[in-house]
Amino acid sequence: MKIAVTGKGGVGKTTFAATLARLYADEGKHVLAADVDPDANLGLALGFDEETLDSIIPITKMRKLIEERTGAGADNQFYTLNPKVSDIPDTYSKMANGVRLLVLGTVETGGGGCVCPEHVMLRRIINNLVLHRDDVVILDMEAGLEHLGR
């Protein structure tokens, strides 16, 4: 099952996503929670400790990996829409309280550029996941609806 929690800002999307993730984990499901909100707080809401949160590398910080997989770079305006991503959830997520967490990241500064290749990577990760009966993916999305059109 794949669930995207989306909507207006400040309405409790992160709290709801974290609650769903913990409830499914408590039921014995294999849960992957993806924090797609640039104001990433899902890890805190899930009860991850600071040391674990600090050790998570957001997808937006994986510049070399993104360039290798998508061909995106400073000199290239085009990028691959179907990069290899099958290893990313297991390699780059962290586990706490029965929930694996994957973080997209954010734009660090104004004028920092588009995070389109990063969104492509995340979309491919979510689409590529082969789910079994006890697998659940929870996406804590950014406010608004623009990301649904990407």
Q: Predicted regions span which residues?
A:
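Hydrophobic positions on the alpha1 helix immediately C-terminal to the Walker A/P-loop
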Residues: F16
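Walker A (P-loop) phosphate-binding loop of P-loop NTPases
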Residues: G10
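N-terminal phosphate/diphosphate-binding loop that engages ATP/GTP or pyrophosphate donors
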Residues: L23-N97
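Hydrophobic anchor at the beta1->P-loop junction of P-loop NTPases
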Residues: V5
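Conserved lysine of the Walker
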Residues: K13
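Residue-level preference for the first positions of well-ordered beta-strands
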Residues: K2, H30, L101, V136-I138
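Switch II (G3) loop of P-loop NTPases
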Residues: V103-V115, I126-G149
